[in-house]
Amino acid sequence: MADLWDDIYNDTKLLEELAPIAIDAALLQGVLMRTKESPNSSDVVSFAPFALLPSPVPKALFEQAKCVQEDFNTLVDRISQDTSFLEQVLSSTIKVDDFIRRLFAIHKQVQQEDCTQEVFLGINRSDYMFDCRDDGTPALKQIEINTIAASFGGLASRTPAVHQHVLKFLRKSEESSSILTNDAVEGIGWGIAHAWALYGSVDATVMFLVENEQRNILDQRFIEAELCKRNVRVIRRRLADVFERGTLDEERHLFIDGYEVAVAYFRTGYVPQDYTEQDWEARLMLERSRAVKCPDVPTQLVGTKKVQQELSRPQILEKFLPDKPEAVARIRETFTGLYSLDIGEEGDEAVRVALANPDQFVLKPQREGGGNNLYGEELKEKLQECKDSEERTSYILMDKINPKPLKNCLLRAGGRVQISECISELGMFGVYVRHRDQMIYYDQVGHLLRTKAIEHSDGGVAAGVAVLDNPYLV
């Protein structure tokens, strides 16, 4: 596995020749991002960073991640319907984390107002690394599950063609034909279209809720194109636009700029800096509305690290999946050690062990978007700072996953062509649609492989650390 492409990596002249061919293939396939200098204009775009060659991934672990995704779909949906569980689990976090507190307050307010919802749409992505066990064999271990704005389904659907072209250029036709197709964008588009259809108005629109700066717009445009094929109109608006021009009628139908909104698909709203006070008002309006929210607030809260940690406790999975013992076993097999930092003996012991062995753990806040986790000395400093205060309850502790590094060449605009020691993270996309109490559809719909140099502890493609990749199953 380690020497899959060594004949290429050892040929510096070939690498220099190959890199521009791969970059042009990415341009031809639309694997693109806007530039940092002009994040809201497509006049000038660049290729999204990607790996020169596909990274080897154990076939058994890929299939394991694929198989368990439907289980995670069911689990996320069921937890999102249990407000008392979310309130109990997040009670300590809400005291010290204003972002989580405000989200939960919106959920409680909408519940008290009895703003019933009939159609539910979930688009999530469960991320894993391949932990190297003591005997040298790899094991699939979950990093997190993203329940809001799970990105790169669009671009990931186009990267297989890039690596197929590169391998054909290298006269490796058999290897080229082994690159997996990736139907993430079709599955995501199908899920949104199905929710739109269940809303029941052919004149209604799908609204993408987007950030003020939209570098990754091309990833979203692929999903828009899928919806266009199905004759579903898409509009793009910011939360600020919803506040300024959004209205609810007496039956809670949401309108903006003359459009009735059937589905509100979030590609923003996952970190505190996404919100002004007016944006929070817009989020409340959206949550009150009859529009299908992807996600609604409780589903977003299911994706918090605190809920992830709580699910690792005995009997919690069984509480939500009492009819699915095999699913419980599949999910539990992906868990690594997760530890509460709540005030009390259990949290005190976790702090003590982490301070004594900081390189064995990751300190994780309740934040999405990459680049937020703390490792090593930074972990130690933060825990020393907050070990005796309630601030520590805004974090969880997780065993550090240790993948075996592999070689690759990471291509970035303006970057050098050089070989790096890398690790990869595998994401599986899941989509589900529920109508009242009936699950209409739930499936694993595609994958995402991101690879980064080992010197980077945290951060994804959008954060400028990882690059897009494809799994080459071995």
Curated annotation (Swiss-Prot):
List of residues binding Mg(2+): 144, 146, 368
Pathway entry: Sulfur metabolism; glutathione biosynthesis; glutathione from L-cysteine and L-glutamate: step 2/2
Binding, ATP: 144, 305, 364-373, 375, 398-401, 425, 452, 458
EC number: 6.3.2.3
Tissue specificity of this protein: Expressed ubiquitously.
Database matches in PANTHER family: GLUTATHIONE SYNTHETASE (PTHR11130:SF0)
Family statement: Belongs to the eukaryotic GSH synthase family.
Assembly and interaction partners: Homodimer.
Protein name (database record): Glutathione synthetase
Species name: Xenopus laevis
Lineage: Eukaryota, Metazoa, Chordata, Craniata, Vertebrata
Gene name, Swiss-Prot/TrEMBL: gss
